[in-house]
């Protein structure tokens, strides 16, 4: 009985390690924060981490602790709890250009042809690398605060639509939608 319980615990931890190993995490920002107490200042650290599986799932988290490794661990756990799925075109770029905002920060994301790479600054680059996007052009305007930039990027990604979802919303075929996108003047077969 005890051996079964022990083995079960080991198997659960092994499953958890396998699940966690599929994720890539990037530390975006670490900040030293201070709490003023009666005896002076008590210092701690706040960490912002982005986690993704490089296949279309990504999340970000924030963690605070007295030590840096503990803050990073808390932020990573928070990010894994807040994963969102993003539809990618050909598994490498966005389906369409989009803008997102949070606070005074705005970001503009543009789909890019193959071979372009990730042209984005700081916090946005971490989001795209963990998401699995290989080709994108991004510009941030306004606030350069890492928290605002990450949240604005997630706001933009949240409003991203795949052709399948657009076609379902409009009650048309995906092929009709794709023909309009590629050709512009291409003949569209009436349904």
Curated annotation (Swiss-Prot):
GO terms for molecular function: rRNA binding; structural constituent of ribosome. One of its GO terms (biological process) is translation. Residues 23-86 form the S5 DRBM domain. The keyword rRNA-binding applies. Pfam families: Ribosomal_S5, Ribosomal_S5_C. Residues 1-21 are annotated as: Disordered. SUPFAM superfamilies: dsRNA-binding domain-like, Ribosomal protein S5 domain 2-like. The keyword rRNA-binding applies. It comes from the Bacteria. Keywords: Ribonucleoprotein, Ribosomal protein, RNA-binding, rRNA-binding. GO terms for cellular component: small ribosomal subunit. The N-terminal domain interacts with the head of the 30S subunit; the C-terminal domain interacts with the body and contacts protein S4. The interaction surface between S4 and S5 is involved in control of translational fidelity. Belongs to the universal ribosomal protein uS5 family. HAMAP family: Ribosomal_uS5_B. Part of the 30S ribosomal subunit. Contacts proteins S4 and S8. With S4 and S12 plays an important role in translational accuracy. Located at the back of the 30S subunit body where it stabilizes the conformation of the head with respect to the body. This is Small ribosomal subunit protein uS5. It comes from Rhodopseudomonas palustris (strain ATCC BAA-98 / CGA009). The lineage of its organism: Bacteria, Pseudomonadati, Pseudomonadota, Alphaproteobacteria, Hyphomicrobiales.
């Amino acid at each position: 009985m005890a051996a079964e319980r022990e083995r079960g615990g080991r198997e659960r931890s092994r499953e958890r390690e396998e699940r966690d190993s599929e994720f890539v995490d990037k530390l975006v920002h670490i900040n030293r924060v201070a709490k003023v107490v009666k005896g002076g200042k008590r210092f701690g650290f706040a960490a912002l981490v982005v986690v993704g599986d490089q296949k279309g799932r990504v999340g970000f988290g924030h963690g605070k602790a007295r030590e840096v490794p503990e803050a990073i661990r808390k932020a990573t756990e928070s990010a894994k709890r807040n994963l969102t799925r993003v539809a990618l075109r050909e598994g490498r770029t966005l389906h369409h250009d989009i803008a997102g905002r949070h606070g005074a920060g705005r970001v503009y994301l543009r789909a890019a042809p193959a071979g372009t790479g990730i042209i984005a600054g700081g916090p946005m680059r971490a989001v795209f690398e963990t998401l699995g996007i290989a080709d994108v052009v991004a510009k941030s305007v306004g606030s350069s605060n890492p928290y605002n930039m990450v949240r604005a990027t997630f706001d933009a990604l949240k409003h991203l639509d795949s052709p399948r979802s657009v076609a379902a919303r409009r009650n048309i075929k995906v092929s009709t939608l794709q023909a309009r996108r590629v050709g512009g003047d291409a003949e569209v077969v009436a349904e």
